[in-house]
Design a protein with these regions (language model features):
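Short alpha-helical oligomerization interface
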Residues: 89-101
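Active-site helix of classical SDR
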Residues: 111, 147
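Rossmann-fold cofactor-recognition segment
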Residues: 44-59
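Active-site loop immediately N-terminal to the catalytic Tyr-X3-Lys motif
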Residues: 136-142
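Conserved glycine-rich cofactor-binding loop
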Residues: 9-10
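Residue(s) in the substrate-gating loop at a strand-loop-helix junction
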Residues: 131
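Conserved NAD(P)H cofactor-binding loop of Rossmann-fold oxidoreductase domains
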Residues: 81-87
Length: 153
């Protein structure tokens, strides 16, 4: 199976990558922290196709998804695990902006790209992993909760 995971370098995304890497899958991973991409590449005997991109940078994420799609020719499964958030009790916009750019703007852009790839292929599966914070809210991290509610809905 050909799989692309955005946010595969830490947390749930990394665990999913490790599970799929131990099976007979071809995996493209997208993340912004190059040293962590390199660690996965080395640890798994060059199995992943690592691509550096920051999901909040639409040009980078478009290039990364297109490059992996071209390399793989077909994507069976896309998993969205990326996300960020900050403690910000005062709702300072400068603190919230990266959360909005990552969890709403970049996330929506990537979802849209995968949707069109799957539409073109007439097949494909999309998994979006988000947070229970989108259901109950976090008063100290308001943008994080709001962006996760957006993803859930």
């Amino acid at each position: 199976m050909n799989i692309v995971i955005i946010g595969a370098i830490s947390g749930i995304g990394k665990s999913l990558f490790e599970k799929y890497a131990n099976e007979n899958n071809r995996i493209g991973i997208i993340g912004r922290r190059v040293h962590l991409l390199d660690e996965l590449y080395q640890k798994y005997s060059s199995k992943p196709l690592p691509t550096k991109a920051d999901i909040s940078n639409l040009e980078e994420i478009e290039q990364a998804i297109n490059a992996l799609h071209k390399e793989m020719e077909y994507i069976d499964l896309a998993i969205m695990c990326s996300g960020t958030g900050n403690i910000n009790a005062t709702l300072d916009y400068d603190v919230e902006r990266p959360t909005i750019d990552t969890n709403i703007v970049g996330w929506t852009f990537a979802i849209d790209m995968f949707y069109h790839i799957f539409e073109q292929q007439s097949n494909g599966h999309l998994v979006a992993i988000t947070s229970a914070s989108g259901l109950r809210g976090e008063p100290m991290a308001p943008a994080y909760s709001a962006t996760k509610a957006y993803q859930i809905n």
